[in-house]
From Swiss-Prot:
Misc. remarks from the entry: Negative results: does not show inhibition at neuronal alpha-4-beta-4/CHRNA4-CHRNB4, alpha-4-beta-2/CHRNA4-CHRNB2, alpha-6/alpha-3-beta-2-beta-3 (CHRNA6/CHRNA3-CHRNB2-CHRNB3), alpha-3-beta-2/CHRNA3-CHRNB2, alpha-2-beta-2/CHRNA2-CHRNB2, alpha-9-alpha-10/CHRNA9-CHRNA10, alpha-7/CHRNA7 nAChRs and muscle alpha-1-beta-1-delta-epsilon/CHRNA1-CHRNB1-CHRND-CHRNE nAChR.
Domain notes: The cysteine framework is I (CC-C-C). Alpha4/6 pattern.
Superkingdom as given in the UniProt entry: Eukaryota
Effect of residue 25 to A: 3-fold and 2-fold decrease in inhibitory potency on alpha-3-beta-4/CHRNA3-CHRNB4 and alpha-6-beta-4/CHRNA6-CHRNB4 nAChRs, respectively
Function, as annotated: Alpha-conotoxins act on postsynaptic membranes, they bind to the nicotinic acetylcholine receptors (nAChR) and thus inhibit them. This toxin inhibits alpha-3-beta-4/CHRNA3-CHRNB4 (IC(50)=3.6-18.38 nM), alpha-6/alpha-3-beta-4 (CHRNA6/CHRNA3-CHRNB4) (IC(50)=33.9-94.1 nM), and alpha-2-beta-4/CHRNA2-CHRNB4 (IC(50)=4550 nM) nAChRs. The toxin competes with agonists in the orthosteric binding site of alpha-3-beta-4/CHRNA3-CHRNB4 and alpha-6-beta-4/CHRNA6-CHRNB4.
Species per Swiss-Prot/TrEMBL record: Conus textile (Cloth-of-gold cone)
Post-translational events: Unmodified Met-32 is essential for toxin binding to rat alpha-3-beta-4/CHRNA3-CHRNB4 nAChR. An oxidation of this methionine provokes a 13.3-fold decrease in inhibitory potency (IC(50)=245 nM instead of 18 nM). Owing to its potent activity, derivatives of this toxin have a potential in the development of a novel drug. Unfortunately, the oxidation of the methionine is readily to happen during toxin synthesis and oxidation steps as well as under oxidative environment in vivo, which should still be considered to find a solution to this major drawback.
Protein's recorded name: Alpha-conotoxin TxID
Reported tissue expression: Expressed by the venom duct.
InterPro entries found in the cross-reference section: Conotoxin_a-typ
Subcellular localization: Secreted
Broad class of where this protein is predominantly found: secreted
Effect of residue 28 to A: Complete loss in inhibitory potency on both alpha-3-beta-4/CHRNA3-CHRNB4 and alpha-6-beta-4/CHRNA6-CHRNB4 nAChRs
Disulfide bonds: 23-29, 24-36
Length: 37
């Protein structure tokens, strides 16, 4: 187990969550993204 890796993954998933929220509020991006809805 590598603590630095875990922190990096947390940061990455937080960024992904933010991007996902932004994308899913945009009709075109939301339609193209399977994780929206």
């Amino acid at each position: 187990f590598d603590g630095r890796n875990a922190a990096g993954n947390d940061k990455m998933s937080a960024l992904m969550a933010l991007t996902t929220r932004g994308c899913c509020s945009h009709p075109v991006c939301s339609a193209m993204s399977p994780i929206c809805g």
